[in-house]
Design a protein with these regions (language model features):
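Short, glycine/charge-rich flexible loops or terminal/linker lids adjacent to PRPP-binding catalytic cores
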Residues: 375-447
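Internal hydrophobic scaffold segments of catalytic domains
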Residues: 367-368, 414
Length: 447
C-alpha cells in the first residue's frame, strides 16, 4: 500500500458573469465567495489540519492588489479564514456592501476566480507555511501563480534534482514548494514565448501585457511540467491574470469533478458537494478524466485538454472506501458491495455460527459497508432457513417452524468512536497521544 502523504480536498470556482450580475440576482456580489465556503465546508471530512483560499481580481489597475490569499491552522480553519475575509467588510455601510462596482475597485477578495484547499497530511510537517495555496509572486500578472493540490508524488527527489540543475533554488525541500517552482518556471517560459510573439507583431507596453493574457496557453505549461510527475494528484492553480486550471494524474488515483452553466464553473474533489452547493443533478456533473486538465481562460472560455495519456485505472481505494463522502451515489453503492463481498470470509471466520455472533461496525465511515454486509448475511440466513424448513417434510412441527423463522442476524452498536478524540483526520501533533482513547464500548449492548 502506498504511503499516505496528502489526502486533501480542493475546490475551484470561476464566475462567468460580472459581480453586478450576482448582486442583482442573488442579493450579494459575494456569491462566489459563499459558494466556495459551502464547497469547502462540505468537504471538511477531507482535512482538519488547515485550510486556505486564494482569489484573483480580473480587473485591477497597476499599483492595486489583484491576488489575495488567506490561510489558517486547526480544525476550525475553514471558519477562521472566511471570518478573516469578512472582517475586511465590517466597517462598510450597507450601500458600500451592496455596491459591486465599489467592491471590485476597493475590496480584497472581491474577485471572479477562487480556489480553496483543505489540508490533511501525514508527512509530519506542520505549520502555516505548509498550508495551501502556495503563492509565487512576480511583477508580471501572468507570471503570478497560486497552487494547491490533493497529491502524493513519489519522485520528489528527481523533480528537485531537475529544477536545481537548471539553476532554481526552492526555499524549502517540500513537495508543494518544489512543484510550485517547477510549474512557475514553465509558466515563466510560456509567458516569455508569448511575449516574443507580441514583440514580433510590433506591440509595446500594455499592448504586450494584454496580448500575453489573451494568448497564454496553460496546456503548454502543464504538458512540460506534469510529464515529470509520478504519483497520484489533482493539482489546481490560478494565475495573476485570471487563468485557472486543474489537472488529474493519468492513473485516476485522485478524484476530481466539475460542473459549468452560464453563471459559474466549479471543480471539487467530490461530486456530491457540487450537487449540494449548487443544487444540480448528478447527471450534469462531469468527472475530470485521468490525464485530463480543465482549463479556464481569463475571458472565461472553458475547455478540457488531454495532457497526459491515460494509464491503467488505479483509483485510490482509500479515497473510495474511507475518505470520500458517502453521499455520492457511486461511493455509496461501492461501499455496500464491499460489505456484501466480505460475507463469505466473515462466515468462514465464525464457522458459519450466526446464532452466537453479534455484528457491529467501526469507524462511522464503515456504516454503509455494514449495511451491505447485513444484506449479504440476511440472504445467507434466508437460504439456510429455506433448507431447514424443507428438511421438516410435509407436516412440520409448529414449534420447529417458529424456531427457524425467529432466527435473526444480531447487530448492535457495540463500539463507538469518540468524536472529540477522532485522530485520523485531526491535528498531526496529537494523533499518537490520543489514539488509544479514540474508541469506546457501549456497555450492556451484548447480553
Amino acid at each position: 500500500m502506498e504511503q499516505l502523504k496528502h489526502e486533501c480536498g480542493v475546490a475551484m470556482i470561476r464566475l462567468l458573469k460580472p459581480l453586478e450580475y450576482y448582486e442583482k440576482k442573488y442579493g450579494t456580489w459575494m456569491y462566489g465567495l459563499n459558494k466556495l465556503y459551502l464547497l469547502m465546508e462540505k468537504q471538511h471530512n477531507r482535512g482538519q489540519e488547515g485550510a486556505g483560499l486564494a482569489c484573483v481580481k480580473l480587473e485591477a489597475n497597476p499599483g492595486e492588489e489583484y491576488m489575495f490569499r488567506e490561510r489558517a491552522l486547526g480544525s476550525g480553519a475553514i471558519t477562521e479564514i472566511f471570518e478573516n475575509v469578512q472582517n475586511n467588510f465590517k466597517e462598510l455601510t450597507p450601500e458600500q456592501l451592496h455596491d459591486a462596482a465599489y467592491a471590485k475597485r476597493v475590496l480584497p477578495f472581491a474577485g471572479e476566480v477562487y480556489m480553496g484547499h483543505l489540508r490533511y497530511s501525514t508527512t509530519g510537517k506542520s505549520g502555516i507555511s505548509y498550508v495551501h495555496p502556495f503563492l509565487r509572486r512576480n511583477n508580471w500578472r501572468a507570471k503570478n501563480l497560486a497552487l494547491c493540490g490533493n497529491f502524493n508524488m513519489t519522485n520528489v527527489d528527481e523533480i528537485f534534482a531537475r529544477i536545481t540543475a537548471i539553476g532554481q533554488h526552492p526555499r524549502k525541500y517540500a513537495d508543494t514548494y518544489i512543484m510550485l517552482e517547477q510549474v512557475g518556471h514553465r509558466l515563466d517560459r510560456e509567458v516569455e514565448r508569448v511575449f516574443n510573439l507580441a514583440e514580433a507583431e510590433g506591440l509595446t507596453g500594455m499592448g504586450i501585457t494584454h496580448y500575453i493574457e489573451e494568448h497564454i496557453d496553460l496546456a503548454n505549461v502543464l504538458r512540460t511540467s506534469s510529464r515529470e510527475w509520478d504519483g497520484g494528484y489533482v493539482i489546481c492553480g490560478l494565475t495573476g491574470s485570471g487563468e485557472s486550471f486543474a489537472i488529474r494524474d493519468p492513473w485516476g488515483i485522485r478524484p476530481a469533478f466539475w460542473y459549468q452553466d452560464d453563471e459559474i464553473a466549479v471543480l471539487a474533489s467530490e461530486r456530491p458537494v457540487i450537487q449540494t452547493a449548487l443544487n444540480v443533478p448528478f447527471e450534469e456533473i462531469k468527472e475530470l478524466q485521468p490525464g485530463q486538465a480543465l482549463l479556464i481562460s481569463k475571458e472565461g472560455k472553458i475547455r478540457t485538454s488531454q495532457i497526459n495519456k491515460p494509464r491503467e485505472n488505479q483509483a485510490c481505494s482509500f479515497e473510495r472506501i474511507y475518505f470520500s463522502r458517502g453521499s455520492d451515489v457511486d461511493i455509496y453503492k461501492e461501499r455496500k458491495r464491499l460489505g456484501e463481498k466480505l460475507v463469505p470470509r466473515i462466515l468462514k471466520a465464525i464457522n458459519n455460527d450466526i446464532d452466537h455472533t453479534v455484528f457491529s461496525f467501526i469507524p462511522n465511515t464503515a456504516e454503509v459497508a455494514f449495511y451491505g454486509m447485513l444484506q449479504g448475511l440476511d440472504d445467507y440466513l434466508n437460504e439456510e432457513k429455506v433448507q431447514q424448513i424443507a428438511s421438516l417434510g410435509h407436516n412440520p412441527n409448529m414449534e420447529e417452524l417458529e424456531v427457524i423463522l425467529s432466527r435473526r442476524i444480531r447487530s448492535e452498536k457495540v463500539a463507538i468512536k469518540d468524536i472529540k478524540l477522532r485522530t485520523f483526520i485531526a491535528e498531526g501533533n496529537s494523533r499518537n497521544d490520543l489514539a488509544a482513547h479514540v474508541y469506546d464500548i457501549t456497555y450492556g449492548s451484548l447480553v
